[in-house]
Amino acid sequence: MSHSILRVARVKGSSNTNGIQRHNQRENKNYNNKDINHEETYKNYDLINAQNIKYKDKIDETIDENYSGKRKIRSDAIRHVDGLVTSDKDFFDDLSGEEIERFFKDSLEFLENEYGKENMLYATVHLDERVPHMHFGFVPLTEDGRLSAKEQLGNKKDFTQLQDRFNEYVNEKGYELERGTSKEVTEREHKAMDQYKKDTVFHKQELQEVKDELQKANKQLQSGIEHMRSTKPFDYENERTGLFSGREETGRKILTADEFERLQETISSAERIVDDYENIKSTDYYTENQELKKRRESLKEVVNTWKEGYHEKSKEVNKLKRENDSLNEQLNVSEKFQASTVTLYRAARANFPGFEKGFNRLKEKFFNDSKFERVGQFMDVVQDNVQKVDRKREKQRTDDLEM
């Protein structure tokens, strides 16, 4: 059976938003993705927008209309979340074009219920690749109008629950898709571990009882040995070997009645101790004790392996922290540079007629050349920042006039 697939991811920075826009709306002339069949691109469609849009403008419009937070939005706040809905090729091969569209419309309905219809940006269906899929995007605004990707997306557990809800929703629509086994396997592993812990506690108790019995038997054995050592020396029997010869020892010991009784008790105690020890060795507890020792050694090996893996992960985390610090430094330099370019852009636009038109032509030229595409993206970011400054100043002028 086929599986339902739902993915979401935060989009950081307007340049990444622009890249997603150009990919989704097929604005680039060259693509590294060999799965794209450009002869089929005309079949693509957007379930929200009738024509291509500028993602950044729609994000700004959505925030202007729906944001009601009291604080100013931080420059590094996540304004855009992108996602994907699909299944496998076998699932879509069994559907007609109308049924495929219905599946994606039902999926969009689910997303609108989750994130708010008013916050949805696009729902672009690609039919020009090997497996049909839908790219969707939204502004992570909460029900009370705050901008919070963290609250809207949550953690891994929340994402797992989101996938569960999505699978239930599409199945209610009659698509018969599996959610997958990762969650079930995880729960089984947790249950098995819980049971193992319970069993381990039980066997620890049983093992302690066996140890106590062994110690008791050992003490009795040592006591018997000490008692035998402390017994006073015996007299040896002697006899006359000849009619006229003296008396010689026969090698046999002479015991009094009390000494003989004490010796019998010591021998009986020793026999009981040996019997008890043999009985303990033959019990399941003794066998389980040996098995537990083997399992303990096995678990030690597993723990050591985990420790080695943890050490490697720690080194990797430290490396990533250093890279993050370096990127933050680069980001500060980049922000200062962008601020300078915005100032230069506005000055050139004010003093040189036709500057903006020439800037746009040059930007498009760079975008269509894979070698200079990043330059085009940077120019796009500069224009976006200029537009933000323009809107801010226009709003300030409007507020001043109203006062």
UniProtKB/Swiss-Prot annotation:
DNA binds at residues 45, 115. Keywords: DNA-binding, Plasmid. It comes from the Bacteria. Residues 13-22 have a biased composition (Polar residues). InterPro entries: Mob_Pre. GO terms for biological process: DNA recombination. Residues 10-31 are annotated as: Disordered. GO terms for molecular function: DNA binding. Contains conserved positively charged amino acids probably involved in the binding of the pre protein to the RSA site. Belongs to the plasmid mobilization pre family. The interaction of the RSA site and the PRE protein may not only serves a function in plasmid maintenance, but may also contributes to the distribution of small antibiotic resistance plasmids among Gram-positive bacteria. This is Plasmid recombination enzyme type 1. It comes from Staphylococcus aureus. The gene is pre.
